[in-house]
């Protein structure tokens, strides 16, 4: 009988979480949802020097923002130390591990000799018990590490869902340290116990872990566990072709929120960064879950493309509810010095979003492009001299007069504009440009009738009148 699917995301809370990291949560989440399985969150916090509470918060916040909900956890490895020690004791009883007294200095010297002889540097099994072998006398006052008895012959073979068949000779693997002198278990051991206890059936993770896999499989088999399906994801490259990292300028997951990206756009982009469904570029969360499979995971490194993300975000902004965008835009307005009271006194923010969103790649950009609605106009003197000429002033005055009594609809504003253009034999830009400048303070706006409608009759008429006085 097939086991129910159980996947996991097991980040180390040692700082920064970027798109490359969070992708290792997205794919196991999607696979668990697709297979009606269980998605487990496990925090691998055994690196006490580098693990921080702030990093844990960043992981949880990033997952929540993208909607990557977990069914179990978060489990913390530091809270499972008693369990690891229990398994270590069982392994000692079964002779699966042995104490090794080789010092760091002795190990370094051994590796230097091996390198000088052109050999692969590795532990040579000095303290490994074998029938008929006489072990050295344990040095006084030295607490040993515990090493796992790796098989000496044969191979570790697994069918990787991304890489295909992988075979590693056991002769390539030395006896791994699985407990330090103070009894603290090491990373590769903790991972195996966790995956075994948590019944993980599919391990979907970055291929920087692939070298750990044969060691973990051997420990898992020694403990009588069933080997999960492994899928090792190729790395994510930045736009310069380097591995994505903070050092190479990667932005944190929440940095995208703070830059005005929508979570559905980032999730859609991230899904395509190493997986595909035919030619589909745009798809909902529900479609992604329905379509996701391990067979279509990419086998080559995926390269981040900021322009592609902007294109996707623009699509989702255009699809988004204007009231939602208005709420998302408020912090960006605040950063520009436009507070809630100012917004309340100005044009309807929801209407502004509806008008301005089509041209924007981010919510931040919508806010930046919409400040004209909430600030007094300060048109450039050169632009005024160019557009507000004596020749056009009579037409401006007539247009202002017409707007005092016109019905305040987009259609009526457009009709008034058209009538004045006809009466004064002007082309649209000759009147629209000075109106934009005097009302909005800029010549760069969407259609003039829509902009004036949002500003409102009183503001439009008073600004035109003041400029013509």
From Swiss-Prot:
Keywords for the protein's UniProt record, in alphabetical order: Aminoacyl-tRNA synthetase, ATP-binding, Cytoplasm, Ligase, Nucleotide-binding, Protein biosynthesis
Which catalysed reactions does the entry list for this protein? tRNA(Glu) + L-glutamate + ATP = L-glutamyl-tRNA(Glu) + AMP + diphosphate
Primary subcellular site in the record, as a coarse category: cytoplasm
> Which parts of the sequence bind ATP?
246
Q: Where in the cell is it found?
A: Cytoplasm
Sequence motif 'HIGH' region, location on chain: 11-21
Mind listing the GO biological process terms from this record? glutamyl-tRNA aminoacylation
> Basic and acidic residues bias: where?
118-131
Q: Could you tell me which InterPro entries the record lists for this protein?
A: aa-tRNA-synth_I_cd-bd, aa-tRNA-synth_I_codon-bd_sub2, aa-tRNA-synth_I_CS, aa_tRNA-synth_I_cd-bd_sf, Glu-tRNA-ligase_bac/mito, Glu-tRNA-synth_I_codon-bd_sub1, Glu/Gln-tRNA-synth, Glu/Gln-tRNA-synth_Ib_cat-dom
Membrane spanning residue stretches: none
Q: Which GO cellular component terms, listed alphabetically, does the Swiss-Prot or TrEMBL entry include?
A: cytosol
Keyword Iron found: no
Q: Where is this region: Disordered?
A: 118-139
Keyword Ligase, does the record have it? yes
- Return the CDD domains for the record: GluRS_core (cd00808)
Family according to the record: Belongs to the class-I aminoacyl-tRNA synthetase family. Glutamate--tRNA ligase type 1 subfamily.
Q: How does it associate, per the subunit comment?
A: Monomer.
Q: What is this protein called?
A: Glutamate--tRNA ligase
Organism in which the protein naturally occurs = Burkholderia mallei (strain ATCC 23344)
**Gene label:** gltX
